[in-house]
């Protein structure tokens, strides 16, 4: 009986030590940069096309269990939209620059050299820049010769009222481990905004003015422990 108890205690101790060794917490810190492709979800609808921008930031990743971790990022991202005038030769682009903080669940799989992963979680942001580029008088578009009739125009000149943004982010990617503590990360991510940039009450023009974007980034991470 004593031998059995001793065996069980030894087995439990060995398992605990093994588990602690197997699930040693790891902290990674790094930077990333990439390209964004954005547009707005307006209601009523506005004819538009994807607007290209940039993103850059820093990431902190914490993994405590195999296949699972958490990521926090601090990014500068360009979003916005580009009006689509179809056959009419007008151009209008509006870059909205945000300071973004995604907080993501990180699920990964693979081997010691290359890993695939899925990231998913909420994201908050604050508008820090608003730049309009147009080749016509966008503040008074109805006075512009040959400007398309029956087109929504209020979004062209209205200031952003809600500078705080929030939404959901999801992405997939690959991590290539260069050395024991160094890795390169390629990720594609989609952001779906839940907050409107313009007032959206019944009396307002737009019932929705939410941002959406696709982000493609390349990053580097260093593992501290």
Can you describe what each PLM-predicted range is?
Residues 1-28, 220-225:
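Bacterial Sec-dependent N-terminal signal peptides
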Residues 160, 165, 170, 176-225:
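Predominantly the C-terminal beta-signal and adjacent terminal strand-loop region
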Residues 125-174:
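A charged, solvent-exposed segment within the mature domains of Sec-exported extracytoplasmic proteins
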Residues 20-57, 161, 223-225:
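Short glycine/proline- and aromatic-enriched beta-strand/turn motifs that initiate or cap beta-hairpins
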């Amino acid at each position: 009986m004593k031998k059995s108890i001793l065996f069980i205690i030894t087995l439990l101790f060995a398992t605990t030590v093994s588990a602690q060794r197997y699930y040693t917490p790891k902290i990674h810190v790094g930077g990333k940069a990439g390209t964004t492709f954005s547009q707005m979800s307006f209601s009523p609808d506005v004819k538009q096309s994807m607007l290209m921008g940039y993103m850059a930031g820093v990431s902190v990743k914490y993994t405590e269990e195999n296949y699972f971790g958490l990521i926090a990022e601090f990014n500068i991202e360009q979003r916005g939209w580009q009006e689509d005038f179809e056959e009419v030769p007008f151009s209008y682009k509006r870059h909205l620059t945000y300071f973004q903080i995604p907080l993501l669940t990180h699920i990964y799989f693979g081997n010691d050299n290359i890993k695939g992963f899925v990231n998913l979680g909420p994201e908050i942001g604050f508008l820090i820049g608003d730049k309009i580029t147009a080749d016509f008088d966008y503040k008074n578009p109805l006075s512009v010769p040959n400007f398309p009739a029956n087109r929504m125009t209020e979004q062209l000149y209205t200031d952003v009222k809600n500078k705080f943004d929030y939404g959901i982010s999801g992405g997939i990617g690959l991590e290539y481990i260069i050395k024991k503590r160094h890795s390169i990360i390629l990720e594609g991510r989609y952001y779906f905004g839940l907050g409107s940039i313009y007032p959206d009450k019944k009396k307002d023009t737009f019932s929705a003015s939410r941002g959406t974007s696709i982000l493609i980034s390349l990053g580097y991470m260093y593992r501290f422990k």
